[in-house]
Swiss-Prot record:
Assembly and oligomerization: Interacts with CXXC4. Interacts (via PDZ domain) with NXN. Interacts with BRD7 and INVS. Interacts (via PDZ domain) with VANGL1 and VANGL2 (via C-terminus). Interacts with ARRB1; the interaction is enhanced by phosphorylation of DVL1. Interacts with CYLD. Interacts (via PDZ domain) with RYK. Self-associates (via DIX domain) and forms higher homooligomers. Interacts (via PDZ domain) with DACT1 and FZD7, where DACT1 and FZD7 compete for the same binding site.
Lineage of source species: Eukaryota, Metazoa, Chordata, Craniata, Vertebrata
Main function: Participates in Wnt signaling by binding to the cytoplasmic C-terminus of frizzled family members and transducing the Wnt signal to down-stream effectors. Plays a role both in canonical and non-canonical Wnt signaling. Plays a role in the signal transduction pathways mediated by multiple Wnt genes. Required for LEF1 activation upon WNT1 and WNT3A signaling. DVL1 and PAK1 form a ternary complex with MUSK which is important for MUSK-dependent regulation of AChR clustering during the formation of the neuromuscular junction (NMJ).
Protein family according to the UniProt entry: Belongs to the DSH family.
Annotated DEP domain residues: 400-474
Protein name (record): Segment polarity protein dishevelled homolog DVL-1
Pfam families assigned to the protein according to its UniProt record, in alphabetical order: DEP (PF00610), Dishevelled (PF02377), DIX (PF00778), Dsh_C (PF12316), PDZ (PF00595)
Organism: Pan troglodytes
Amino acid composition bias (Polar residues), ranges on this chain: 600-611
Amino acid sequence: MAETKIIYHMDEEETPYLVKLPVAPERVTLADFKNVLSNRPVHAYKFFFKSMDQDFGVVKEEIFDDNAKLPCFNGRVVSWLVLAEGAHSDAGSQGTDSHTDLPPPLERTGGIGDSRPPSFHPNVASSRDGMDNETGTESMVSHRRERARRRNREEAARTNGHPRGDRRRDVGLPPDSASTALSSELESSSFVDSDEDGSTSRLSSSTEQSTSSRLIRKHKRRRRKQRLRQADRASSFSSITDSTMSLNIVTVTLNMERHHFLGISIVGQSNDRGDGGIYIGSIMKGGAVAADGRIEPGDMLLQVNDVNFENMSNDDAVRVLREIVSQTGPISLTVAKCWDPTPRSYFTVPRADPVRPIDPAAWLSHTAALTGALPRYELEEAPLTVKSDMSAVVRVMQLPDSGLEIRDRMWLKITIANAVIGADVVDWLYTHVEGFKERREARKYASSLLKHGFLRHTVNKITFSEQCYYVFGDLCSNLATLNLNSGSSGASDQDTLAPLPHPAAPWPLGQGYPYQYPGPPPCFPPAYQDPGFSYGSGSTGSQQSEGSKSSGSTRSSRRAPGREKERRAAGAGGSGSESDHTAPSGVGSSWRERPAGQLSRGSSPRSQASATAPGLPPPHPTTKAYTVVGGPPGGPPVRELAAVPPELTGSRQSFQKAMGNPCEFFVDIM
């Protein structure tokens, strides 16, 4: 004979009840179910049954027609009996019973009409805990009594909108009364204060059964008080987040025939506050999700194909995803969109940014460097092509609204500031620079950017890879900050040139140049003294000229051989034995050979004075012994290089090269 199993839940009781009806599952009705529950006040309950809806899936359906057939799942019926609002029984039996004759009522944690299954309330215990000395008849009687008391209490709480103290005064009972009314008032409150806990503990009874029940009820209320406060705090949080993060549910169907993998990583976010769910952690390039573009990191994964991901652990979600991807056919992902995880246009909270001290000098230099940048309209007017200057392409690439994602990235637990991915650079070049017929040409262009120093790898790799992180090179980022005084203060990095001589002194430039120099500027005072002149022995001039040559050898390798010759010439300046001097070609100047006698004859007065009185300035009449060859028109007389004292030859040669070849002299900073 066919029979039907009906599993029903009574309010928030943890353990469900099971009854069997001698009726086929497809023929069982609500009237058959109520006949089995004849010992319960079925007229005071609403009947909800587990049912399947085409739009929402599994739901709880209320059935009130006695002739309606009950929905059946796997040969059984699942039902919930919820106390109806306004239902109450005879109130006279409540006032006549003493408090010690009744067991404690059930502890209610949900509101009226709460149709959640009992699994949502794991801390609720049965009302008959610790009452093993009752008989079956006493249990049934006390069960009916507590039902009546609870219905009366809830009716009074709903119809009376006054606080607990007002209701107590309306009843006319003192605060320490041990009557049923006071007990119901305490149990119906959401938060039990310490004084009410004390009054509850002072309610004594002659039976051990009632005392143990009171202790259990008091313990439950304390736990319930803490849990409700946590729920209140969480509800205040949700009221804030719901107003700012409204969800938008999107269903995305992916064609897995064009892509080899799904390309997502999922993260489980379960915690004590119940904020559970499976979230999209990251999206990998080349996958089906990245190609679609509608799913972003931070979205909540609700359903994949027909599998619901709610209340699913992270391991189960990974297993289900792998099984679905291994199958053929399209995949449908249902996600709840969240707000932008990386907002750019509205408020942001820089939680991950470190706090750095402010350097005023660096801030000023950075501001000054920005003032020398190219105007925006010049960059926007001229479109970028493959023939454009690489520096201009890189400058446009670094603009905030260029479309290239430049941000801090993590690599091997190292933060790389303002880094880009090689694949993004290639895509940006292929999209924004004209002249590339295919993408691999843009990749070659990106490789040339790395080769010329516009891009720089973290570990200085010279080969370009689309999977690596790159930063912009110092050549394009620090070019605006360069100036002529940016060298170090060491003597080996600077040219030590003697200042211009006194206007009354002979002009040091010879007639070897095809053009004439103007006279010295009138800014020098009449009493100007040349501190670069060496009045000591010949070795002093050699040291000074030697210092002036060292910077040239370090700054430009092309002038190293000429400077080495100058150093040798300066070292032998005291003897006057060297007469062959060379200069760089291409500037129109010539150096003429002079006999050794001319050098020794021109330098003999200064050499004798230096030998007789080292470290003392010679008398001025000695300057008249120089041979005057000629000078620029309107300027002082000019003497030949051979007439210059040997200890000053090296410094004067360096000065002549600087004045005669200015382009070569400043070629180091280009």
